[in-house]
Amino acid sequence: MAFYNNSFDSYQLFLNTEPFAYKAEINLFSAGVFAGRIVFHADGDTSISNQEFQPGGTTYKVPMLAYPLSRIGEIMDFLRYEKPLFISLDTVSNRAYLATKEREAVGEQEGV
C-alpha cells in the first residue's frame, strides 16, 4: 500500500510497434531521476491498469498510469503547456491522475 505524489520536469516519449503491449509510453523525470510513467493501451483494452512500476536498475518504485491511446493528444498538450506538474497514484483506492502543482489563472490564454 503506497501513495505517490511525484513532481516531474521532463519527459521522454516512445511510440512503440509490435510486439510491445503498450502502444506508446512516456517516462517522466525529476532532475534526471525517474519519477513516473504513463502508458497507452489500445482503446477498449482494459487489461492494463494503473500500478507501481520499478524502473530497471533501481531499487525504488514509481507510479505508472494507464490511458487509452485516444487520449495521447490531450496528455501531450498537457505536458507541453503546463508546469509545474505531478503524477499521483494511491495503490489502495487505485485513484491516479496527472495534475498541475499550482493553481492556474482563469483565462490565461485570452488574447494570445
Positions of the model-derived regions?
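OB-fold ssDNA-binding interfaces and closely related basic DNA-contact patches used
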Residues: 1-44
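A short, sequence-level motif marking secondary-structure junctions
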Residues: 40-47, 102-105
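Low-complexity, compositionally biased segments
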Residues: 8-12, 19, 46-48, 80, ...
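Short, conserved turn/kink motifs that form compact alpha/beta structural patches or helix kinks used as
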Residues: 43-77
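Surface-exposed beta-loop interaction hotspot
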Residues: 8-17, 53-63, 106-112
